[in-house]
UniProtKB/Swiss-Prot annotation:
GO terms for molecular function: rRNA binding; structural constituent of ribosome. Keywords: Plastid, Ribonucleoprotein, Ribosomal protein, RNA-binding, rRNA-binding. It comes from Helicosporidium sp. subsp. Simulium jonesii. One of its GO terms (biological process) is translation. This is Large ribosomal subunit protein uL5c. Coiled coil: none annotated. It holds the Pfam family Ribosomal_L5_C. It is found in: Plastid. It comes from the Eukaryota. InterPro entries: Ribosomal_uL5 (IPR002132), Ribosomal_uL5_bac-type (IPR020930), Ribosomal_uL5_C (IPR031309), Ribosomal_uL5_dom_sf (IPR022803), Ribosomal_uL5_N (IPR031310). Part of the 50S ribosomal subunit; contacts the 5S rRNA.
Length: 181
């Protein structure tokens, strides 16, 4: 899947972008640098937190093919009841082959499965052109088995785009097949 989507990017998107925007070099075309998938532990009960973390690690492994990094607290914050080295969340950074495989799956399978998803809004882009999608339930992922007894656990998908400005990042997203409002 990576080779197909990567080859599609190289053979179709880059030449079309160069033609449409009067660019001369392929290096002037915006490119996706990485995809970060993260989940906060949040309201997990302290008695069930180990089980919650283990299930989250398994879900991330199935979803991305990579073991997630555990994000820990750097210091103690009494007001939030956070202890030093307490696990606050999980994250996976995808690059290369796994990034393109996940991007293909995200655009063509996951986004169409989300109820009431109409497209990317302007507020989802930051000032550098990166996009963040909140996915509110793991039931949108086809690889993960549906279990009605398990609470909905969402995650965030951040796509890091190297572009000169936001309009170039939006153009790349449109060429890739993201629905833009």
């Amino acid at each position: 899947m990576k080779n197909d989507f990567f080859n599609y990017y190289k053979t179709k998107i880059i030449p079309q972008y160069l033609k449409d925007y009067n660019k001369k070099k392929a290096l002037e075309v915006p490119v996706i640098k990485k995809i970060v998938i993260s989940r906060g532990i949040g309201k997990a009960n302290t008695l069930e937190i180990n089980n919650y973390i283990e299930e989250s690690i398994k879900e991330f492994l199935i979803m991305t093919g990579q073991k997630p990094k555990l994000n820990r607290a750097k210091k103690h914050i009494a007001a939030f009841k956070i202890k030093k080295k307490m696990i606050l969340g999980l994250s996976v950074t995808l690059r290369g082959a796994k990034m393109y495989a996940f991007l293909y799956k995200f655009i063509n399978i996951i986004l169409p499965n989300i109820r009431q998803f109409q497209g990317i809004e302007n507020k989802q882009f930051d000032s550098l052109g990166n996009i963040t999608f909140p996915i509110y339930s793991q039931s949108n992922i086809p690889e993960l088995p549906y279990n009605p007894r398990v609470e909905k656990r969402g995650f965030n998908v951040t796509i890091n785009i190297k572009a000169k400005n936001v309009s170039e990042a939006k153009a790349l997203c449109a060429y890739l097949g993201f629905p833009i409002i």
